[in-house]
């Protein structure tokens, strides 16, 4: 059992066979050692009791009922005498039944078996350490070929006959049919190596420090060679350099964690506690069992058959032994990772068995479903909608969620301010929704941040802190600029809200997690708070006005619908006039005209603008020049209008725009001015 006060983290890694045996081994008072699972049976079909030395054995994993052994005798869990802790008849320990959640067993494999995660994973750790191709290692593990044992002290049979040129040479033809089982075992122990045992021997002979030194020397040699000009050779050199770096990192990791490379080949297979792979009896004599039990049964049966062939059947052909070793390897592979060698194992109803990898990985795996995705107090969940009036660091919480999250704080303040005398009356005031409750709730929320999280949390911007504000309705309001960090949109996405309770959590939320402090992507440094989706559509609609300038009036004059017939013979129709496109001296006048419904959002208009040297010094030729009786003139360009006097002096400039462009410009101008003021304060 993991003690939550002693253990602060969980690490998954390799362990030695001695450690696996220590997890499961028990010594009975009579000196008998239990812990090894040798039978594939589970429960007896008549008594419904666990079979001895089976997958649910009470001697190995503990009693099903607390303090009651397999015989039915009961005794206190705590006994002064060591002999009294075990039943003298059945050997079951008198302990709490919860031990079956963490007490493990083991299967002693008749032959070494490689761990499929370390052989077929990407990258393959075994192939990287041995510096061998993965396909050849797989062929060696599954008995497709053998190689000669390197032996320099004495001549071997294969060396005398000259069948192999190198110390380690492949033998692609079968040797085993020429030997009986004892003869083949003797031959294999002296001359050849095959199966996972050959991999284990090579891993055991490795010196990790020498691997690091040799790999570093080779990497430096490749680095000094430089580029040869041959694209294919340069590519092979780059791949080799990357491989050497990975190999050095892997060897360094093994040294730092005190892990031996040969532990990647299993001699003892751990058996999970029975409560983690239960058998459930339902009504109607229906039995529901975990798929892992069936996979364990398969491993035990094949392992027992191999042990029988190796120990008791002296006349069995060696091909049968090698085939059985391959079956044991495949059974363990299926238990650890179903489908690693192609088609996964299926039951009689064509349903795929779930292996240990399937139980652990994925969204419904053990980690994400039961360890990471647990329900917690002081949290809520609702659909998100856009909050256009919110600041970047604010979020809108519905009244129903806010009063639930901050209920204890509201009760505390109600009692502190003597609005109520006890907790019961305070809860009644909250339930009746009295006005004082909302006043205190707003005071409490003003200085307390909340955390918003959208699953899946793939990076640290998936959970950010916000200052909550009360909103009507039942949805959470969110500023649209923070959507990219959450990878969220407003089409029905849901987000969870959490309340940090401790002062440390609140300080971390304010200093590190507030949304206005996470403006850049932590991965690449690009801005993360950029307009996306709904905002882009809104900006497009806001600035969709006539972009082709005054010349577009010839094709679609202001106020005409696309289907309206235009008389192009009338030259005055598309001629510039002040009546069609009104003039405004300021943006406030234009906004006032829009509120009075005199102009539309995308109606073209002329807005008086400050003198701009880029416009004054422009060499653009006007489209039309109009002169008035007092000598003033109007030079009309595609997007602006220049008004001059008789002395050819520019009196004013009007730009051709729309109210949408004006509104967008005002928002950007206010944002830039606010940033400049904030920057000046920091200086």
UniProtKB/Swiss-Prot annotation:
User: For this UniProt entry, what's an example GO CC term?
Assistant: mitochondrion
| Molecular function terms, GO-annotated | DNA binding; DNA-directed RNA polymerase activity; magnesium ion binding; zinc ion binding
Q: Which keywords annotate this record?
A: Chloroplast, DNA-directed RNA polymerase, Magnesium, Metal-binding, Nucleotidyltransferase, Plastid, Transcription, Transferase, Zinc
Q: What does this protein do?
A: DNA-dependent RNA polymerase catalyzes the transcription of DNA into RNA using the four ribonucleoside triphosphates as substrates.
Which SUPFAM superfamilies is this protein grouped with? Answer: beta and beta-prime subunits of DNA dependent RNA-polymerase (SSF64484)
- Lineage of the native species? Eukaryota, Viridiplantae, Streptophyta, Embryophyta, Tracheophyta
Pfam families per UniProt:
RNA_pol_Rpb1_1, RNA_pol_Rpb1_2
The UniProt note on the cofactor reads as follows: Binds 1 Mg(2+) ion per subunit.
Places the protein is found: Plastid, Chloroplast
**Residues that coordinate or bind Zn(2+):** 69, 71, 87, 90
Record EC number: 2.7.7.6
Q: What class of enzyme is it?
A: transferase
Entry's transmembrane regions: none
Source domain of life:
Eukaryota
The cofactor required is: Mg(2+); Zn(2+)
Question: What is the name attached to this protein's record?
Answer: DNA-directed RNA polymerase subunit beta'
**GO terms for biological process?**
DNA-templated transcription
């Amino acid at each position: 059992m993991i003690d939550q006060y002693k253990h602060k983290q969980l690490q998954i890694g390799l362990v030695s066979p001695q450690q696996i045996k220590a997890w499961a081994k028990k010594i009975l008072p009579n000196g008998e050692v239990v812990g090894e699972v040798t039978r594939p049976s589970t429960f007896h079909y008549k008594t419904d009791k666990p079979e001895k030395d089976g997958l649910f054995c009470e001697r190995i994993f503990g009693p099903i009922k607390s303090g009651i052994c397999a015989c039915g005798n009961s005794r206190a869990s705590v006994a002064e005498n060591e002999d009294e802790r075990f039943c003298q008849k059945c050997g079951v320990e008198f302990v709490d039944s919860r031990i079956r959640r963490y007490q493990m067993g083991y299967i002693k494999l008749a032959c070494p078996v490689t761990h499929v995660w370390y052989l077929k994973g990407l990258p393959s750790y075994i192939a990287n350490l041995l510096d061998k191709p993965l396909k050849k290692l797989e062929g060696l593990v599954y008995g497709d070929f053998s190689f000669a044992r390197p032996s320099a002290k004495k001549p071997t049979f294969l060396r005398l006959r000259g069948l192999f040129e190198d110390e380690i040479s492949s033998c692609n033809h079968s040797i085993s049919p020429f030997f009986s089982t004892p003869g083949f075992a003797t031959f294999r122990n002296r001359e050849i190596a095959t199966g996972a045992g050959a991999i284990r021997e090579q891993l055991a002979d490795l010196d990790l420090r020498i691997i690091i030194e040799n790999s570093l020397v080779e990497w430096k040699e490749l680095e000094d060679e430089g580029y040869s000009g041959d694209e294919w050779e340069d590519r092979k050199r780059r791949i080799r350099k990357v491989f050497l770096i990975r190999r050095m990192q892997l060897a360094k990791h093994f040294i730092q964690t005190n892990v031996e490379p040969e532990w990647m080949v299993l001699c003892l297979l751990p058996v999970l506690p029975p409560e983690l792979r239960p058998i459930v009896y339902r009504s109607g004599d229906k039995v529901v069992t975990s798929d892992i039990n069936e996979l364990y049964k398969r491993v035990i049966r094949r392992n027992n058959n191999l042990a029988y062939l190796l120990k008791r059947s002296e006349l069995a052909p060696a091909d049968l032994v090698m085939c059985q070793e391959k079956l044991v390897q495949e059974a363990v592979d299926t238990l650890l990772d179903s489908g690693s060698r192609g088609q996964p194992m299926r039951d009689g109803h064509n349903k795929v068995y779930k292996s240990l990898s399937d139980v652990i990985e994925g969204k419904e795996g053990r980690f994400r479903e039961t360890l990471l995705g647990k329900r917690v107090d002081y949290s809520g969940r609702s659909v998100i909608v856009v909050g256009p009036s919110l600041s970047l660091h604010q979020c809108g919480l519905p009244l129903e969620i806010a009063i639930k999250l901050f209920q204890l704080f509201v009760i505390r303040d109600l009692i502190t301010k003597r609005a109520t005398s006890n907790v019961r009356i305070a809860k009644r005031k909250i339930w009746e929704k009295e006005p004082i409750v909302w006043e205190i709730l707003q005071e409490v929320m003003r200085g307390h941040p909340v955390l918003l999280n959208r699953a899946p949390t793939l990076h640290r911007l998936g959970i950010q802190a916000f200052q909550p504000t009360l909103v009507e309705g039942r949805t959470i309001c969110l500023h649209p600029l923070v959507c990219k960090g959450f990878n969220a949109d407003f089409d029905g996405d849901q987000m969870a809200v959490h309340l940090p309770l401790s002062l440390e959590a609140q300080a971390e939320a304010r200093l590190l997690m507030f949304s206005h402090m996470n403006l850049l992507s932590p991965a690449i440094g690009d801005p993360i708070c950029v307009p996306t989706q709904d905002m882009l559509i809104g900006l497009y609609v806001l600035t969709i006005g006539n972009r082709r300038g005054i010349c577009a009036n010839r094709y679609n004059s202001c106020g005409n619908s696309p289907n309206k017939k235009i008389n192009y013979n009338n030259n005055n129709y598309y001629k510039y006039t002040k009546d069609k496109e009104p003039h405004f001296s300021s943006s406030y006048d234009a906004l006032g005209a829009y509120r009075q419904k005199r102009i539309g959002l995308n109606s073209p208009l002329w807005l008086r603008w400050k003198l701009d040297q880029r416009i004054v010094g422009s060499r653009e030729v006007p489209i039309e020049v109009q002169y008035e009786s007092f000598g003033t003139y109007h030079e009309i360009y595609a997007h602006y209008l220049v008004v001059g006097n008789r002395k050819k002096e520019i009196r004013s400039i009007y730009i051709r725009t729309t109210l949408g462009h004006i509104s967008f410009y005002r928002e950007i101008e206010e944002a830039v001015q606010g940033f400049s003021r904030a920057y000046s304060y920091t200086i």
